[in-house]
């Protein structure tokens, strides 16, 4: 009985290998009917570009900036920058002065640099995935 089963399995295996190993031939698309549909290519839009054209590209946005953007300001990176990001969103630039438990030195640094900040509504393109503290730029 086992020889019959072995022989049968061998035949099935040989037939399967022979049948499934044949590669189908590629056939050209028939375009003789004159109707060709093509995708309409639109202009690529990066959602960040619109925001960067605004004041965000010139000043540090308190609601959308990553911690690394604060490196250009002396005394902000990383501690004060992290506190600013953790207490966002802000309705106005002056709201950053209301962060709890700021030292006098930190408060003075914020007041000195208020003109370098802006506030825009939080944009998913910049804060999606909670990547404001570690953007992965190394």
Curated annotation (Swiss-Prot):
Coarse class of the protein's main subcellular location: membrane
Keywords carried by this UniProt record: Electron transport, Membrane, Photosynthesis, Photosystem II, Signal, Thylakoid, Transport
Gene3D superfamilies according to UniProt: Photosystem II 12 kDa extrinsic protein (1.10.150.320)
Record localization: Cellular thylakoid membrane
Propeptide span(s): 29-42
Record carries keyword NADP: no
CC annotations in GO: extrinsic component of membrane; photosystem II oxygen evolving complex; plasma membrane-derived thylakoid membrane
InterPro entries: PSII_PsbU
Secretion signal, residue range per the UniProt entry: 1-28
Bilayer topology annotation: Peripheral membrane protein
GO BP term, example: photosystem II stabilization
Pfam families per the UniProt record, alphabetical: PsbU (PF06514)
Source organism superkingdom: Bacteria
Similarity field: Belongs to the PsbU family.
Subunit structure comment from the entry: PSII is composed of 1 copy each of membrane proteins PsbA, PsbB, PsbC, PsbD, PsbE, PsbF, PsbH, PsbI, PsbJ, PsbK, PsbL, PsbM, PsbT, PsbX, PsbY, PsbZ, Psb30/Ycf12, peripheral proteins PsbO, CyanoQ (PsbQ), PsbU, PsbV and a large number of cofactors. It forms dimeric complexes.
Role: One of the extrinsic, lumenal subunits of photosystem II (PSII). PSII is a light-driven water plastoquinone oxidoreductase, using light energy to abstract electrons from H(2)O, generating a proton gradient subsequently used for ATP formation. The extrinsic proteins stabilize the structure of photosystem II oxygen-evolving complex (OEC), the ion environment of oxygen evolution and protect the OEC against heat-induced inactivation.
NCBIfam families named among the record's database cross-references: PRK02515.1
Alphabetical list of HAMAP family matching this protein: PSII_PsbU
Protein name: Photosystem II extrinsic protein U
Species for this entry: Picosynechococcus sp. (strain ATCC 27264 / PCC 7002 / PR-6)
Organismal lineage: Bacteria, Bacillati, Cyanobacteriota, Cyanophyceae, Oscillatoriophycideae
Gene name linked to the record: psbU
């Amino acid at each position: 009985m086992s020889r019959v089963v072995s022989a049968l399995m061998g035949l099935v295996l040989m037939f399967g290998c022979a049948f499934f190993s044949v590669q189908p031939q590629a056939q050209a698309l028939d375009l003789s009917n004159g109707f060709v549909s093509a995708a309409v290519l639109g202009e690529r839009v990066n959602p960040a570009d619109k925001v960067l054209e605004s004041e965000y590209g010139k000043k540090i946005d308190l609601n959308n900036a990553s911690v690394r953007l604060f490196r250009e300001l002396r005394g902000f990176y990383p501690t004060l920058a992290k506190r600013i990001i953790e207490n966002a969103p802000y309705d106005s630039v002056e709201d950053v002065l209301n962060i709890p438990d700021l030292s006098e030195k930190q408060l003075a640094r914020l007041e000195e640099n208020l003109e370098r900040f802006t506030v825009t509504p939080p944009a998913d393109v910049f804060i999606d995935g909670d990547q404001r503290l570690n953007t992965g730029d190394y």
